[in-house]
Amino acid sequence: MENSLKSSGKPLAAPKVGMVSLGCPKALVDSEQIITQLRAEGYEISGTYDGADLVVVNTCGFIDEAVQESLDAIGEALAENGKVIVTGCLGAKKSASGSGLIAEVHPKVLAVTGPHAVGEVMQAVHSHLPKPHDPFVDLVPAAGIKLTPRHYAYLKISEGCNHRCSFCIIPSMRGELVSRPVAEVMLEAENLFKSGVKELLVISQDTSAYGVDVKYRTGFWNGRPLKTRMTELVGALGELAAQYGAWVRLHYVYPYPHVDEIIPMMAQGPLKGHVLPYLDVPFQHAHPEVLKRMKRLANAERVLERVQKWREICPDLTIRSTFIAGFPGETDAQFETLLDFIREAELDRVGCFAYSPVEGASANALDGALPDDVREARRARFMEVAEEVSAARIARKIGKTLKVLIDEVNAEGGIGRTAADAPEIDGVVYVEPAAKASKRYKVGEFVSVKITGADGHDLWGEV
């Protein structure tokens, strides 16, 4: 155990952080990672209490003696410096009353996190000791380098996938599911909103599985515990979006049961209008035998019931999905079941691919491969039905006034999107020019648009 910070009369004005590291080698590695990240972001490390702008204390809570030593170290840091962030095993320990032990003994600490929490520690450091941004020196903005327009951005929350769909080789390329630490995700989201992003598109290979690999481990954000789980993450992102008047849109939502918990957030309460009533759910097919061969969830009737229940709770819900037509062994009757599902579910936006073998996919070994012309004919027929359903749903929006995010401004007015439209893959709204110069639209702003027309894909409207 080491506490190398001592008092000296050498005050420094630069952003400097002191580090007290206690506990086992695993805790020492955590401290090394924190220091590495601090240095990577331009902070300096102070060897004295009074030479530091704040102090991070990495604690141990394994045995009573270690608990007391950690509490004493926190007290010393508070007395010598006054600004203290606490991390490590003791951060997760409760007192006899059930509250956090550290907060009860030392209520003046700035923030408390658990172990393995580099992201949470850095978020706390940023909150209490912001790193000055010098545009002449710093090459990378806090939000990172983005290839999307300034007003929307993608937020990847995990990598890899635990499914073994027979038509897919993603797990062999990207590996098993690895969820990003929840504080790291939240920090990136906050930086994006601060940079002017008005729409955050949450993506992964399987958004619904977020946190499964870490058993929904509890992290910390803004001084409060936050589970590494989709439901809790969406709620926290929605709260953050509300602070900045922004949107959160969910993509690649595999229809696990806990997805039902998200729907009320979209329909009511303070998150309504921020967690968008939009789900991108990759159903892929509707016949149980085909789904079984795909190694997908096979209870299509249950899925249809859930879709209908979602719409009862949230009538404005937009559902986008993707499907595969002509999968090996798909019969005419099974394909008709798929078309019936599209009609009954009234999906708003769909894409369909004619099945095509992918090198390395287990589906290549399935019997019943269909000729190319049959696969393509089924894809075309599917899209005919899907477009009929979509056109009918879009037509219901005529006469309504909708919130539109402007993506482009030109001589003909503006082009934007509603809550029902993700960029690049869904429709757009063509907005007539503003009547007055002072009312001209700006890219990245929200405007209220009265819908005056529609086709099978896009809308037209006026302010």
Swiss-Prot record:
Residues 395-463 form the TRAM domain. One of its GO terms (cellular component) is cytosol. GO terms for molecular function: 4 iron, 4 sulfur cluster binding; aspartic acid methylthiotransferase activity; metal ion binding; protein methylthiotransferase activity. [4Fe-4S] cluster 2 binds at C161, C165, C168. Its cofactor is [4Fe-4S] cluster. Residues 15-130 form the MTTase N-terminal domain. It is found in: Cytoplasm. CDD domains: Radical_SAM. Coiled coil: none annotated. [4Fe-4S] cluster 1 binds at C24, C60, C89. It catalyses: L-aspartate(89)-[ribosomal protein uS12]-hydrogen + (sulfur carrier)-SH + AH2 + 2 S-adenosyl-L-methionine = 3-methylsulfanyl-L-aspartate(89)-[ribosomal protein uS12]-hydrogen + (sulfur carrier)-H + 5'-deoxyadenosine + L-methionine + A + S-adenosyl-L-homocysteine + 2 H(+). Binds 2 [4Fe-4S] clusters. One cluster is coordinated with 3 cysteines and an exchangeable S-adenosyl-L-methionine. SMART domains: Elp3. Residues 147-392 form the Radical SAM core domain. PROSITE patterns: MTTASE_N, MTTASE_RADICAL, RADICAL_SAM, TRAM. Its main location: cytoplasm. Gene3D superfamilies: Methylthiotransferase, N-terminal domain, Nucleic acid-binding proteins, tm_1862 like domain. Its EC number is 2.8.4.4. Keywords: 4Fe-4S, Cytoplasm, Iron, Iron-sulfur, Metal-binding, S-adenosyl-L-methionine, Transferase. NCBIfam families: 30S ribosomal protein S12 methylthiotransferase RimO (TIGR01125), MiaB/RimO family radical SAM methylthiotransferase (TIGR00089). Belongs to the methylthiotransferase family. RimO subfamily. Catalyzes the methylthiolation of an aspartic acid residue of ribosomal protein uS12. This is Ribosomal protein uS12 methylthiotransferase RimO. The gene is rimO.
